[in-house]
């Protein structure tokens, strides 16, 4: 008869205690990481559209890439709603995280203040003369696919990481960069296209990013 198995003691008692950073120190460390990897600093397409030096083909391709970013991200918003740490507050009005993401999702879908955000991106491509079938069959760049689904990996893994990756590192940084205003003005001035999507995002991402900063300090 084989020897009976033994329940192994896996507790590592010789390990030192890990001390969490203070909120201020953690946020400062996070800000340094975000600053070192800020995509808006190295992006050459946005300023080229802003000053009118981008070809129309580049402008169209950027619009198609942006459509898929919105198409893939929007269905993930309910994860932030359902995973919010105060989702079971007495009422939604008593919550912060839950109420914020519920409003954010409603806004993205066109039920709160602005038009549906994915539809705005479709209208952006139509304004540039891109047929719907071309948009439907377009294959986004690997960089677009990788960046979107890396972010969604964190959204799916935990609320805290989703808040940090999407709300703080993306929406807040996007709002601070001023990219939406640059694109709105550049497209209107140099390509005779007025894009509602960028008009909306020039204020919406700033507002959402500010709220994400406050929520980050509360988790």
Features from the language model and the residues they span:
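Non-heme di-metal
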Residues: 2-219
């Amino acid at each position: 008869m084989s020897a009976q198995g033994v329940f192994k003691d896996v507790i590592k008692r010789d390990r030192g205690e890990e001390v969490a950073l203070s909120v201020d120190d953690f946020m400062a460390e996070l800000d340094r990481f975000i600053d070192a990897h800020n995509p808006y600093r190295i992006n050459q397409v946005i300023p080229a559209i802003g000053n009118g030096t981008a070809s129309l083909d580049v402008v169209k391709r950027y619009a198609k890439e942006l459509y898929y970013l919105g198409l893939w991200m929007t269905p993930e918003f309910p994860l932030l709603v359902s995973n919010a740490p105060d989702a079971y507050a007495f009422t939604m009005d008593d919550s912060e995280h839950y109420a914020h993401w519920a409003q954010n999702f409603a806004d993205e879908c066109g039920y709160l203040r602005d038009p549906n955000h994915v539809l705005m991106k479709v209208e952006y491509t139509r304004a540039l003369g891109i047929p719907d079938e071309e948009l439907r069959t377009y294959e986004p760049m690997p960089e677009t696919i990788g960046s979107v689904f890396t972010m969604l990996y964190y959204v799916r893994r935990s609320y805290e990481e989703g808040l940090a990756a999407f709300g703080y590192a993306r929406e807040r940084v996007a709002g601070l960069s001023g990219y939406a205003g640059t694109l709105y003005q550049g497209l209107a001035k140099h390509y005779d296209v007025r894009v509602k999507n960028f008009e909306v995002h020039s204020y919406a991402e700033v507002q959402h990013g500010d709220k994400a900063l406050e929520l980050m300090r509360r988790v």
